[in-house]
Design a protein with these regions (language model features):
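Acidic, low-complexity, intrinsically disordered interaction modules
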Residues: 20-73
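N-terminal acidic leader/helix
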Residues: 2-30
């Protein structure tokens, strides 16, 4: 997980979201693909997470998006 202490709650929320949806193949494939995208800046990673979550999980909050973007950076 990201070492940024400012986003600890967001990262924890995103982690719980991932656990709650652990059987969703689309989410698992997205997470797998994003893990290998080391070329992305945080803002690009955030945008990709936002687009994916809003398309597949319209109720996902910006807190989940932010947490997921930081969660995937490490």
């Amino acid at each position: 997980m990201s070492k940024n202490p400012l986003y600890t709650n967001e990262i924890a929320t995103a982690h719980q979201f991932v656990i709650a949806h652990n059987t969703d193949i689309k989410l698992q494939n997205f997470l797998h693909d994003m893990r290998f995208r080391k070329d992305l800046m945080h803002s690009d990673r955030w945008s990709l997470c936002y687009d994916f979550l809003k398309e597949n999980y319209p109720a996902a909050t910006d807190s989940i998006v932010t947490g997921l973007a930081y969660y995937l950076e490490d």
